[in-house]
Amino acid sequence: LNSINGRRTEILKACLIAGENDRGLFHLTVPTGGGKTIASLAFALKHAVRHQMEHIIYVIPYTSIIEQNAQVFREILGQDNVLENHCNVDYGDSEELKPMQLASENWDKPVIVTTNVQFFESLFASRSSKCRKIHNIANSVVIFDEAQMLPLEYLKPCIAMMENLMDFYRTSIVLCTATQPALDSIFDQHRRYIELCPNINEQFKFFKRVIYENLGIIEFDTLIERLKTEKRALCIVNTKKCAQQLYEQLSGDGVYHLSTSMYPKHRKKILAQIKERMSDKSKSCVLISTSLVEAGVDLDFNSVYRQVAGVDSVIQAAGRCNREGIEKKENSKVYIFDINGMKTVPGQSLQSSITKGLLQDYHDISNLECITEYFKRLYHFRENDLDKKNIIGEFKDWKYNFETVSEKFHLIEENTRIVFIPIEQEAKDLLFEIKNQGYGKARMRKASQYCVQIYNQLFDTLYGAGIIKEI
């Protein structure tokens, strides 16, 4: 038990035993590195066999984690038993892959890996093409990975839908995370859950690999100077603009930059360069990024700098530091800071201010008590925003306004436009194909690897200046 693999095995065994439980609500609260992906799959398989359930559905916030997890599941369960269903997956037009294309439309495979957006928007949809999957969600084990990532504005409707699936569709729900949100107050007061991870407090102490240090408010130049002295460091800031400014100031050998302003293919290329550089222990590497590296990116740094954000985000960032526990935790620091004069990201100021308050009260913000307190405060202050568009109201008094709900329910708000960037030759060839042969599904999925999303205001400016053209 005093080794990482020993602890992972303990958690895995506990999940297998718990698989014999009746259908219902389960939590799997496992610290980073505790093997929650395999443990949750083991629980789901045992539970599905016990109750003759038909599918295991993994619901994940980021496509980057989906691709990673789906590959793990394929290695265990075989290629044909796992279906990825999200915007970046491409089953092409070949006869060989047609069954997978059809399966992706109605989720007709034993294990389905999908996004929060695909899952919930199918359930709240009014179009038959979106609703085709619903009969295959019934009698399934549904696992929400990184459950704390459910958008606050839709939290109550999402929880209400989970309860509906458990009560009427013979479905079991697993909320899986290292930072379990305090959802008891939102679920029905009579709803009970079973925790799958044994001895949670002890597990969190064992897997603690870093020391948190609060730097408070610092100057931009001070941050630059600190990063210049680091050999292997990751710095995560809250805006793309700030990330770009830091990168430009630091720019040099071994300094890298990642943000969603770069199209997916470009990001993958940069990640490959970073991994190659980090494989040589003698070389320095400093990465400046936005929060996109907090999940699904397999990188390991000696130090992590995280601009103040929600406690869950800070803990996610800490997961990129001393990942395998090889270094002493005293030598693996996570520095929390804010930059003097830097504006707070719209919609994130409450999360940041709650974290600042908790940094005064708790020496270690990864403490389970601190995590629970963070979510309690967040849900208390945002109580009136947890169903911001009154989705639940549309189902009261025997009203079933699915068309209205479908128009209201968008986990990703539609205030952005997609821009295709044909810099690489493959993208230019693809653009030529689209112009001459039209928008096929497979072509559009390939095109998504060369696309970025920009806000409407910026789009209008660029379009007006003739920088962006319509295809």
Question: What function would you assign to each model-found segment?
Answer:
Residues 172, 176-228:
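Interdomain hinge/linker at the junction between the two RecA-like core domains of SF2 helicases
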Residues 22-44:
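Walker A/P-loop
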Residues 78-124:
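Inter-Walker segment of RecA-like/P-loop motor cores
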Residues 63, 83-97, 238-241, 255-272, ...:
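Conserved helicase motor
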